[in-house]
């Protein structure tokens, strides 16, 4: 039997995952973070991207988070996400359209464009697509 830790992934709308896991990998502000049982206590921010959990039975689940916080305690890992969606529920076509729209806004050089918002939309669309790709690779 593998060594495990309890993990909760929640957003303002819902609890998306709660269970025992062998490990978790998330997109932290300074790069990917790998969390395993016995990890030192930690509180950090998360970037938009995939959170990959390896469940107690070895099955993997990929969840997209749009940012948030990751807290590690001795026997519990908590992801507090701005929004969270299971990778299998993501709409690739919508993410591709959002990415293209953001690229067009950034390329047009118009004075009424909010470049900060367009950049954030591009980053989130790319993170959604990266999550979809990671989900496909884990199948």
Swiss-Prot record:
HAMAP family xref list: ATP_synth_epsil_bac
Subunit structure comment from the entry: F-type ATPases have 2 components, CF(1) - the catalytic core - and CF(0) - the membrane proton channel. CF(1) has five subunits: alpha(3), beta(3), gamma(1), delta(1), epsilon(1). CF(0) has three main subunits: a, b and c.
Protein's name according to its UniProt entry: ATP synthase epsilon chain
Keyword Chloroplast listed: no
Protein family membership: Belongs to the ATPase epsilon chain family.
Keyword Ion transport: yes
Record function comment: Produces ATP from ADP in the presence of a proton gradient across the membrane.
Main location per the UniProt record: membrane
GO cellular component, as recorded: plasma membrane; proton-transporting ATP synthase complex
Pfam families named among the record's database cross-references: ATP-synt_DE, ATP-synt_DE_N
Keywords in alphabetical order: ATP synthesis, Cell inner membrane, Cell membrane, CF(1), Hydrogen ion transport, Ion transport, Membrane, Transport
InterPro entries the UniProt entry points to: ATP_F1_dsu/esu_C_sf, ATP_synth_F1_dsu/esu, ATP_synth_F1_dsu/esu_N, ATP_synth_F1_esu_C, ATPsynth_dsu/esu_N
Protein's membrane topology: Peripheral membrane protein
Locations listed in the record: Cell inner membrane
GO MF annotation list: ATP binding; proton-transporting ATP synthase activity, rotational mechanism
